[in-house]
């Protein structure tokens, strides 16, 4: 199955703060990123790891990512402990490993291998290079795995984390994922490590220890659980599931999937909508689109309309596997750009039983024709020429051009639409969130070829609701979609509202 984890995920089968720190330490050490490693080593000490535990993680890693990386990481830890001691911080030293009472570590290592793997170590390469078998048994699984200041579960967690950020080690990674599971690491925890790894490779924060706050006031009566699942392109999606008050896993609930605006993440208005609908008794799922936020997908910041449509169906897949979800009552709310993507998804996936869009954008039409269909043929050709030239540059240098829909500073000649978006996306008291990092400029060509309403009549007889602000610059997208859709359908115009007013209560 493409679904990574079909079990209800909760705090008991996600990584603890200490485990998150160990995974992050292992990743940064393997990558040789000493600046980030120093930060996460300090965080690990602050959340209860001992100096001995951190030393042991870094010592073991020499076997998996090389002596120079291990040595460099240990130097970083050594200097950090000196700095913290000078600041009066008393870090717990932790205990040293117990002595190993054996003169034949090759035998001990073989015994440890059997316990660790659940089977004898196999592989033609061990016959081809018997010295490797000798070193693995006597040293790695003998000397190192006999050191009892880290348990084997933690050692395998560290190993999986390190291998997950290295290139060319897929077979070894899969082998150690199996070893980790054999030693008590859950599939949900593996998925969390792999999401952290994707973020590590792309210079993003790694874990909930670094979690930026949501842009809205959270409701303590609503339980939120982070979940991970794959779409059909094998991209790992990260979502947050909002559970209604007095949630009972033995019941069957209607569910709503909430898609965020184009140029946004799940911690903004889609999360707010998810929370509000959970208050009304639904199980809701707010996800990050492929290539954005905490979701996977490389190269980062790509916009692939097909993937963004697929994300909705993948979310249906995952929800439909939960025992507390009624498969015949799964609906979608698409906000802004996700409105267009969700229309396309509902046209193609009859499992989506109802659809609502809010301040919908047809990103294909907006990119092809400009807002208000104001783009000339000459301007369109010029944009495609710019995209083509940028592709040459990226092919030559590998450096992407990243485009933000909202400028960092508002110019004096900014129009009303730019001011409206700026007041939300660049306002730290309203909608700004650091997890959104823009899109690739070259993605505009793919968007031009996106026609989300091509099969909109196929949504019928399932109901569709289009919601738009009375004064929204985007209102015509909803009106045109309403005209093209078949019954049952409804167009609701919110009096006095503009486009962004429907994102949050501050509008």
Give the residues covered by each predicted segment.
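Conserved alpha/beta-hydrolase
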Residues: 276-296
């Amino acid at each position: 199955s493409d679904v990574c984890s079909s079990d209800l995920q909760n705090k008991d089968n996600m990584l603890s703060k200490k485990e998150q720190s160990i995974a992050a330490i292992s990743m940064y050490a393997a990558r040789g990123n000493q600046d980030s490693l120093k930060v996460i080593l300090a965080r690990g000490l602050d959340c209860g790891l001992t100096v001995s535990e951190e030393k042991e993680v870094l010592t073991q890693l020499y076997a998996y990512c090389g002596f120079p990386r291990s040595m460099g990481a240990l130097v970083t830890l050594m200097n950090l402990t000196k700095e913290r001691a000078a600041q009066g911080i008393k870090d717990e030293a932790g205990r040293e490993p117990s002595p190993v009472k054996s003169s034949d570590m090759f035998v001990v290592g073989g015994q440890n291998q059997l316990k660790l793997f659940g089977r004898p170590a196999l592989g033609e390469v061990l016959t081809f290079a018997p010295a490797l078998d000798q070193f693995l048994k006597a040293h790695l699984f003998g000397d190192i795995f006999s050191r009892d200041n880290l348990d084997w579960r933690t050692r395998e967690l560290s190993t999986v984390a390190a291998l997950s950020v290295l290139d060319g080690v897929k077979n070894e990674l899969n082998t150690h994922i199996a070893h980790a599971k054999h030693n008590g690491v859950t599939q949900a925890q593996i998925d969390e490590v792999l999401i952290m790894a994707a973020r590590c490779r792309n210079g993003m924060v790694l874990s909930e220890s670094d979690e930026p706050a949501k842009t809205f006031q959270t409701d303590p009566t609503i339980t939120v659980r982070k979940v991970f699942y794959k779409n059909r392109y094998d991209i790992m999606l990260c979502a947050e599931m909002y559970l209604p008050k007095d949630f009972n896993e033995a019941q069957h609930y209607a569910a709503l999937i909430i898609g965020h605006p184009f140029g946004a993440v799940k911690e903004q208005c889609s999360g707010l909508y998810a929370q509000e609908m959970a208050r009304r008794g639904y199980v809701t799922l707010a996800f990050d689109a492929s290539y954005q936020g905490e979701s996977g997908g490389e190269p980062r910041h790509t916009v692939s309309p097909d993937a963004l449509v697929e994300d909705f169906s993948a979310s249906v897949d995952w929800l439909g596997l939960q025992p507390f979800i009624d498969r015949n009552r799964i609906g979608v709310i698409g906000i802004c750009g996700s409105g267009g993507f969700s229309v396309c998804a509902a046209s193609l996936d009859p499992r989506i039983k109802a659809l609502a869009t809010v301040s919908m954008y047809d990103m294909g039409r907006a990119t092809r024709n400009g807002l208000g269909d104001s783009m000339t043929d000459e301007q369109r050709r010029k944009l495609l020429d710019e995209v083509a030239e940028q592709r040459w540059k990226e092919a030559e240098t590998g450096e992407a051009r990243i485009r933000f829909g909202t400028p960092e500073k508002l110019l004096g000649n900014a129009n009303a639409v730019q001011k409206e978006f700026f007041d939300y996306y660049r306002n730290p008291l309203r909608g700004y969130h650091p997890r959104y990092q823009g899109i690739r400029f070259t993605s505009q060509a793919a968007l031009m070829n996106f026609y989300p309403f091509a099969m909109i009549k196929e949504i019928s007889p399932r109901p569709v609701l289009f919601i738009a602000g009375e004064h929204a610059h985007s209102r015509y997208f909803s009106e045109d979609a309403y005209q093209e859709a078949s019954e049952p359908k409804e167009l609701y115009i919110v009096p006095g509202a503009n486009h962004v007013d429907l994102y949050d209560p501050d509008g």
